[in-house]
Amino acid sequence: MASTTPTYIDPAPPVSKSARSTGRAGDKIFAGLSKGSGILLLVIMASIAVFLTYRASIALSKNEGNFLTTFDWNASANPPVFGIAVLLFGTVVSSIIAMAIAVPIAVGIALFISHYAPRKLAAPLAYVVDLLAAVPSIIYGIWGALFLVPQLNGLNLWLDEYLGWTYVFDKTQVGVARSLFTVGILLAIMILPIVTSVSREVFLQVPRMNEEAALALGATRWEVIRMSVLPFGRSGVISASMLGLGRALGETMAVATVLSPSFLISLHVLNPGGGTFAQNIAAKFDEANEFGRDALIASGLVLFLLTLLVNGAARLIIARRKDFSGANA
């Protein structure tokens, strides 16, 4: 009977105290830097909020009008009268138009790149989309003022003729297409690359086994997307949409270049005129006196709070959907 000789395995060399202490020191340094970065972010946010609140309180204490409902903006008058009704309306309406146009198109482009386009086409198309996200706002503004506005004059006439009965597209004022509708279209073009890029990456994370299982059961490509890809990426699409909405709410130069500002509220979105928070601040800040700047900062505080509210609502929606998905897993 053959005897077997046990193989002797050398134990792992002991870790020296110096190496162990170096590793622990590195962990402590990294943990400290991470914690410090988080605290720094909170400090920056808090300092911005405190600064805006302090400067806004100075202006609001002397405002003779209702800050939320006054249509006029005359902070240099004696007594000063100013309000954000027109600015809030214009910001919300233009952002809604932008989201209504951009999100469906962005999701369609993202699905095409991730699930339909051949690889030779998907890679350059994704690169072009990412490149569009890096175009400066002022370039979009110049293009919108010199090209988009003249082109939309004909579209406005068509909408007025065939959809004017909806009241929203009833154009009651004569003028070029420097309206909230034009601003919404321009903002949609600007946020389209952001929503597309994030949605595309989310759709690419769908487990391959889920798609293959659905195809093996006889599902068509569209059924796979409808029953597997879209439900999986719903939270990501919401996050992408909120990123786009954040840019639409705070966009300044492009809106200021395209829009004809006026302090009027009209549901006729094709009529020229209107205003947004960012556009009004950019247009008036340099020429305003100290009190006028405080008034503009007060409107900036509202925009700051509006952005926080939108992002908070988006996070709440995403969290609830994740909890619902986990409960039904």
Model-flagged regions — what are they?
Residues 245-290:
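Glycine-rich helix-loop "coupling/hinge" segments at transmembrane-helix boundaries
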